[in-house]
Amino acid sequence: LFDRYSWMKYSPDRKYLVYVKKHNLYVKGNGEMGMDTTEVQLTTDGVRYYSYAHDGGTDEEGEVMSDICWCPDSRHLYLVREDERLLRDFWVINSLDDRPSLTTYRYEFPGDKNVTQNELVIVDVIGRTVKKTDISKWPDQYINPLCVTKDSKYLFFERTKRTWDEVDLCSVNLSTMEVKEIIHEVDKPYRDPHARSVAILNDGKDILFRSERTGWGHYYHYDGNGKLKNVMTSGEWVAGQIASIDTLGRTVYLYGYGREKDIDPSYYMLYKVHIDREGVTPLSTEDGQHQVKFLKSNRYYIDTYSRVDMEPKIMLKDNKGQGILELAKPDIELAYKAGWKKPERFVVKAADNITDLHGVMWKPADFDSTKVYPIISVVYPGPYFGHVPTSFTLEDRCCTRLAQLGFIVIAVSHRGDTPMRGKAYHRFGYGNMRDYPLADDKYAIEQLARRYSFINGKKVGIYGHSGGGFMAAAAICTYPDFYKAAVSCSGNHDNNIYNRGWGECYNGVKEVEKVVKDSLGNETKEYGYKFNVKPNTEIAKNLKGHLMLVTGDMDKNVNPAHTYRMAQALIEAGKDFDMLVIPGAGHGYGSADKYFEKKMYRFFAKHLLGDTRADYWGDINRNK
């Protein structure tokens, strides 16, 4: 009832609502709760790109959404306010408007001098005060609010250095505005922002902090002053996301990866962990990917587990992992009757001949082991998640459909693709964003071609979207005699012009300190940042096979400039290639997605199967 307007943020007691108008914060009472509905302006310094709005670049005159968050006391709010005024513009053009129009947005490149400045703002709606917290420590630092204690006395947050290799866990007293540094962590070469995890318990008296200080992600129990009380988990496996916490029982339920032998290390397995001492109890016994949902009491949970080759089971279990009741059984008989077949799992070695890589293989429905099929690798480099499916699904990014044309289709992991296999595995690609996954993909295909006589290792294709598009183009230009055809969609081919946070974290950025003297001889320190990455444009000249480049011309994530630069490099090298620009499309292709898929199918059929019928395609309905 109360949240019918998305731009309003209601207080927990529903007495107040806060919103943004013309970049400033406003509050008023909820008339349905008997409160005064007079609008009160809380701030006056909000401007475009230094706003209190969710979208700091908005030019809306009316009410808009804010990222501000209420505290439990329904009095205080907090917000990370972003100052983007010095950022440079980026553009896309919508050619489908009546008069083609320019869309301008702020965008940071790796190594930029002027980047977003983050402020932590505390608002008191009763006292009508807005205060900026003094949290400055590092230039261009990132701020990540975590939680507020139940008594609304303290807000916990993380601040991270621009180079991503240092982080502080801090608290701020909402009454005095005093900031306290609790835990300082140095993590070289970087602390993965997608794998971090902190739990604040008992109003800050207990802190569960995840760290990779041993080379493996594990949890450590600190007191409220930052003193380490005990290690909770350890060993050569990864403790991951927390599923539930029983504060009275002093127990944590969390996912773990790679602890159990002969089980894919990417599978989510559930474990029971004690807060006050080290040790884990496995709760997942079935070989599969587990997703759990605990009941409020933490006495029971629902466990849905499956594999790509095993249908889901949905079980009610107790908190000791014992099955009580199967709740439901999916019915996919229609899929089987239509000829659908489960994909198959496989394991190969990485190019180091040591590391196991897990993959999935799709075959045609009419597969004949006496025939020989070209192979297509569907790729994504990571490094913040692995792209190989682990759960049962009928929707697999067109892999099943592609296989029906007469291909063996695979998705295989590679070193550096996921944080769930330990720090050494995950950081494999640091400083080498373009090349790190390529050798493993090539070597995996070579092993499969030797293992299975039905795979033609001389007819190899590769396809990917976004980072996968970047990887597909890099692969065919790095190993031009191996990959014969590649479809590269919306690829970030030149990471010098891609997302700053992505490039500086996963490829690395070097902080350069310089001492500057003013006219009076006073010295101050200035910081600059150097970013070095290898773009695909440097290797475009190596292309021998067939390459299709695809982009949406309204893509504000991976700007079409990436694809245009790659195309220009190919033109300058005198290379023949295919290119599809989808008008009006962003990073996804929307209503044109099926059109793109058909283009891709015909491209691979022509260049890997020798099927040229698509060259003579026509619309049989055109004369109706």
Where are the regions a protein language model picked out?
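Conserved beta-propeller blade repeats
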Residues: 2-18, 27, 48-76, 104-112, ...
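Serine-hydrolase catalytic core recognition
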Residues: 147, 152, 289-624
